[in-house]
């Protein structure tokens, strides 16, 4: 029985020009109707940053050119069964993501 913790990644995508963050609206699946950031589970034999780039590609329909990936936090649950790595990626311009089936909308927002 594998007792390794489940690990996930997530990233805030921040537009430095408009000072807004990209959020995605979940589709009619798990957590339907909730807003969140790009992210997901780290697959077996995948490194953290590989997983992050894969999730960006899957959820936004493309990659971010020459991303500057800034680690923010590594959260570990009290029981150690779950680890979540959080990052921020600054971009120069807002863009329109090509959403996959996991999401039905997006918005760029300030945190105020």
Language model feature labels by segment:
Residues 1-21:
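Conserved N-terminal beta-strand and adjoining loop/helix that marks the start
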Residues 6, 17, 73-96, 107-111:
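Active-site-adjacent beta-strand/loop module that shapes the phosphate/pyrophosphate-binding cleft
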Residues 7-9, 31, 83-85, 102:
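Residues that flank catalytic or metal-binding motifs in active/ligand-binding sites
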Residues 19-59:
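Conserved Nudix-box catalytic region and its N-terminal flanking loop in Nudix hydrolases
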Residues 63-73:
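A short coil-to-beta-strand element that immediately follows conserved catalytic motifs
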Residues 96-102:
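Short, charged, solvent-exposed linker or helix-capping segments at domain edges/interfaces
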